Amino acid sequence: MIHSLFIVNSGGEVFLEKHWRSVVSRSVCEYFLDAQRAAPYDVPPVIATPHYYLITVQRDTVSLVAACKQEVPPLFVIEFLHRVVDTFQDYFGDCSESVIKDNYVVVYELLDEMLDNGFPLATESNILKELIKPPNILRTIANTVTGKSNVSTTLPSGQLSAIPWRRSGVRYTNNEAYFDVIEEVDAIIDKSGSTVFAEIQGYIDCCIKLSGMPDLTLSFMNPRLFDDVSFHPCVRFKRWEAERLLSFIPPDGNFRLMSYHISSQSVVAIPIYIRHNFSIKTGEQGRLDLTIGPRNTLGRTVDKVKLELTMPRCVLNCLLTPNQGKYTFDSVSKTLSWDVGRIDVSKLPNIRGSVSITPGTTNIDANPSVNVQFQISQLAVSGLKVNRLDMYGEKYKPFKGVKYLTKAGKFQVRM
C-alpha cells in the first residue's frame, strides 16, 4: 500500500525517508513542494504524479508525504499519517525537525513496527510502548554503552488481548481521569457584523491513569448538539447510537476520545466582535481604527488575542498607536500584526492611526480582512456540558475533572 514515507521541513527539505516495498526517489516530493509553493495554506491532500500518488498531511512545522503506487483509500492513509505524528508526540513530547533528528533510531524502530510491508500493523500507543520503550536519559546512556536498542524482546500482552489499546497490569497510586473539551470556531463575519458562515470543530482529549481494567461511561447534558462524530476505537458505537452515551474501556495515558463537528449557525455563538473603520482616499493618507471586545463569553476572559491584516498593495507604512499590546508591519508582505494579549472589558483594546500610501495611486484594492486568533478558558462556545462520569469494574474512587477551552480556528472579519 504505502511504498515510502518522506518527512519534509518548513523549508522544503526532506530530512527523513523510510521505504518499505521499494525505494522511491525523493525527487517525487517536488510535486508536493510545487503545490505547497502555489498554495501554502491549501495543499491538496492527494497529488497524482506520473508513477505515484502522493498523500500528504501537514502538522505544525513538518509535512508527511506518503508515496503509493496503486490507488488506495486516501482517508485510510491520512489517518495513518496522523497516527504517526501523534505517536511521535506521545514518545518525544513534540514532532519537530530537531526532535525527530535527535531520536532517529527510535523513529525508525517505530516506523518498522507501525507498518509491515506497507500495511499498518501496530498503531496503538500502548502496544508500541511495550514493543519499543520510550527514550529517556538513563536508557539512552545504557543503550550507548551496551549497544542494545529500545526494542523489547517479549511480545506485548495487548497484542493478544481482546482490548489491544490497553496494556495489562496497570497500577497507579493515585487514580485519575481528566477530560479536555476543546472547540475551534471557524467563522466569517461580514462588514456589518453579521455572521456569513460559522461552524465548530471540537474534540475531547483525555488523560486516564486508572488501575486495573475500568469500564467508563461519560454522559453529556446536551448530546444532540453533535452533527458529526468520530470516535477512538475503544468507544462502543452501538451504545452511542442507542443512548447517546460514551461507553468505553480507556487506553492508558493520553488519547483523543472523540472528535465532533457542529455546523448549525444558530448554535455557534460568536465570542468576540470587532469595530473597525478603514478608509483611504486616492493620493492621500488613510485612517485605520480597530477595537476588539468580548461577546457571549459568560464572563470568561478572552486571552492570547492576535489580529492580522493583509493591507492593500498601495500601502507603504502604518503609523499606529495601540492602547494595549504591540504591532508590527511588514512592508514587503503588507501584513499588519497586532499582538493584543488579554482583553480587559474595562478598557477595550484599540489601535488607531494613519496609513501612508503610494503617491498618485488611483486604483485602491479591496478593503482588508482581519484574521483573528484567541483563546477562552473554561468555556465551550457550543454550550456543550459533560454531565457525569461513571466507572464500573473497579472498586476505588478516582479523581475526576473536566476543562473547557474555546479557540479560534479560521476566524475572519471582513472590513
Model region roles, listed by residue range:
Residues 1-176, 182, 188-194, 206-212, ...:
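Acidic, low-complexity cytosolic segments
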Residues 132, 142-415:
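Intrinsically disordered, low-complexity Ser/Thr/Pro/Gly-rich interaction regions
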